[in-house]
């Protein structure tokens, strides 16, 4: 078994008087849904050394000691004048506290919401601070006259980008990143990491695509050679393409036919983490999300989002046995604005009790709203199973909205083309996959051999399938080929609706493949596969995988085949 590389800090000059310090974790760092591809990550920090020294975005608590060690090897930290913060959270606060102990002379530079957060997490109302609202500059000398661009969104209301005209580097914090760890500092061969960037966008940016478009408009005013991102490779070679992609992905969200208003507040970040996973489930099903942090939103913004939405989901922590005041205010707006034919959902985290979720749920039930998923209550921090449940709940919510719209739309006969496409037949199979504590499965008939050497195949996976999360490049799965004559039982089992995070393999005879995925013991044959790449194909992903192992379990059996008459459904 290969050993995991230890966490470290990679240091490299990236421009005139400018250095990156990349704190690297080679394994999955956190349980948030954005890290689910499990390719590790980097927390990128930057040092600009003009006549004065500025440090940008020190990493979170995981890297505190190794980061400060690396920093002290390269300079006297008492010479640092400024620490510029793209956003502030409790995780980053641990590093800031440790830095202040050895460099108490520091002045912090942040947005106005960031200043409020910073004073709170550091428990110091008298911190020396420069607040940047978008018009101020900070002259470090030697041409490094920094400019600041507030780019707030519901998840990061304090988001602040920094631009250095001397190097034409734009420090983008959460924008344009990816959770990948490697030796490559820049994005040479950028097309190979597009999948990771798209996943990062879908998890972090899609729920507030409107604010992303506003940020892109602001950033377009600055001639830029390099995006100095908060995570993953720095963007130099594919900068134009990635900027265009962010535009396209955001426009897909803002022009969607159906929208869900996701309204929440978060005390310690746990409810926000749940909101992010639910939003990911909704958007992957082709429904847009308007994310609103009601701690920072004005009543009219909440009212407008609810009015235009097809449904709404509310999330709240429980503080002192109650929902926070901003949540109670938002609930009042929802009850007075949303007609009760809109679909509703409720979620929240708590420490000792969960009265906030109960309160919201009871108020909505009394008002006659239907629920798109059972209310979600999570004690303390969510884990990967909890986040899978949240993502699948979001997908169920979106599918219910789409189904309701479809029912209202008059069905039309299949066209000649659709009837012709329906004559394409495919083997009946079940895709099974397991990653950590998460497992999933789906019935599949859009399967084809794709290569002889290496032996490879393609599978079309609908974007809103739960198993889609486990079919990214590098993932492993098993393709179970069903046997004619005994396939109906397995077919019916895997066609039935499953609840969020429900065990797909209950009452099914399985064994474990070498790659860790379940093998159906009643299958005709099975193939152990490794995903090499995938292509976006309309409402599906076309997944290409190579076959690493396999076995025929019944030499006399015949493959079950799925016959259709229309190509507009399965």
Swiss-Prot record:
Record carries keyword Amino-acid biosynthesis: no
One Pfam family from the record: Flavin_Reduct
Cofactor remark: Binds 2 iron ions per subunit.
Record-listed E.C. numbers: 1.-.-.-
Enzyme class: oxidoreductase
Flavodoxin-reductase-like as annotated region, ranges: 421-570
GO MF annotations, alphabetized: electron transfer activity; FMN binding; oxidoreductase activity, acting on the CH-NH group of donors, NAD or NADP as acceptor
Keyword Electron transport carried by entry: yes
Physiological role: Mediates electron transfer from NADH to oxygen, reducing it to water. This modular protein has 3 redox cofactors, in other organisms the same activity requires 2 or 3 proteins.
The protein's name: Putative diflavin flavoprotein A 6
Organism field: Nostoc sp. (strain PCC 7120 / SAG 25.82 / UTEX 2576)
Gene: dfa6
């Amino acid at each position: 078994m290969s050993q995991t590389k230890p966490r470290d800090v990679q240091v490299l000059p990236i421009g005139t008087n400018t250095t990156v310090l990349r704190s690297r974790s080679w394994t999955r760092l956190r349980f948030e849904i954005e890290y689910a591809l499990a390719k590790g990550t980097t927390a990128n920090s930057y040092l600009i050394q003009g006549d004065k020294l500025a440090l940008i975005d020190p990493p979170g608590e995981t890297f505190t000691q190794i980061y400060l060690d690396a920093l002290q090897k390269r300079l006297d930290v008492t010479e640092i004048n400024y620490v510029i913060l793209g956003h502030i959270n409790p995780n980053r606060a641990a590093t800031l506290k440790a830095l202040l102990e050895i460099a108490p002379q520091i002045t912090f530079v942040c947005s106005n919401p960031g200043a409020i957060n910073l004073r709170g997490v550091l428990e110091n109302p008298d911190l020396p601070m420069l607040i940047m609202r978008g018009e101020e500059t900070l002259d470090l000398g030697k041409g490094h006259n920094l400019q600041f661009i507030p780019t707030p969104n519901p998840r990061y209301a304090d988001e602040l980008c920094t631009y250095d005209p001397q190097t034409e580097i734009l420090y983008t914090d959460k924008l344009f990143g990816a959770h990948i760890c490697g030796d490559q500092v820049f994005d040479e061969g950028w097309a190979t990491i597009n999948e990771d960037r798209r996943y990062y966008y879908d998890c972090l940016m899609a729920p507030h695509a409107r604010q992303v478009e506003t940020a892109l408009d602001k950033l377009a005013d600055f001639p830029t050679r390099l995006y100095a991102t908060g995570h993953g490779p720095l963007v130099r070679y594919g900068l134009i393409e990635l900027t265009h992609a962010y535009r396209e992905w955001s426009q897909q969200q803002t022009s969607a036919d159906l929208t869900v208003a996701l309204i929440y507040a978060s005390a310690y970040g746990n409810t926000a983490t749940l909101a992010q996973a639910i939003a990911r489930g909704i958007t992957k099903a082709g429904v847009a999300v308007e994310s609103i942090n009601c701690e920072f939103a004005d009543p009219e913004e909440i009212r407008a989002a609810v009015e235009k939405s097809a449904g709404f989901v509310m999330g709240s922590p429980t503080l002192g046995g109650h929902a926070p005041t901003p949540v109670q205010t938002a609930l009042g707006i929802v009850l007075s604005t949303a007609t009760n034919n809109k679909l509703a959902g409720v979620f929240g985290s708590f420490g000792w009790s969960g009265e906030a979720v109960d309160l919201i749920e009871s108020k909505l039930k009394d008002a006659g709203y239907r629920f798109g998923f059972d209310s979600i209550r999570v004690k303390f921090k969510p884990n990967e199973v909890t986040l899978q449940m949240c993502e699948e709940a979001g997908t169920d919510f979106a599918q219910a909205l789409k189904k309701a719209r479809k029912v209202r739309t008059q069905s039309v006969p299949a066209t000649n083309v659709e009837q012709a496409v329906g004559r394409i037949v495919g083997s009946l199979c079940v895709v099974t996959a397991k990653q950590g504590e998460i497992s999933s499965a789906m019935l599949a008939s859009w399967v084809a051999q794709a290569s002889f050497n290496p032996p490879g195949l393609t599978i079309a996976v609908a974007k809103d399938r739960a198993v889609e999360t486990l079919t990214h490049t590098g993932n492993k799965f098993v393709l179970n080929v069903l046997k004619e004559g005994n396939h109906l039982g397995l077919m019916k089992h895997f066609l039935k609706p499953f609840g969020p995070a429900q065990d797909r393999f209950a009452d099914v005879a399985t064994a474990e493949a070498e790659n860790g995925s379940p093998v159906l013991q009643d299958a005709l044959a099975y193939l152990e596969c490794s995903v090499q790449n995938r292509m976006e194909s309309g409402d599906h992903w076309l997944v290409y995988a190579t076959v690493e192992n396999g076995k025929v379990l019944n030499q006399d059996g015949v493959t079950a085949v799925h016959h259709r008459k229309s190509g507009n459904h399965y």
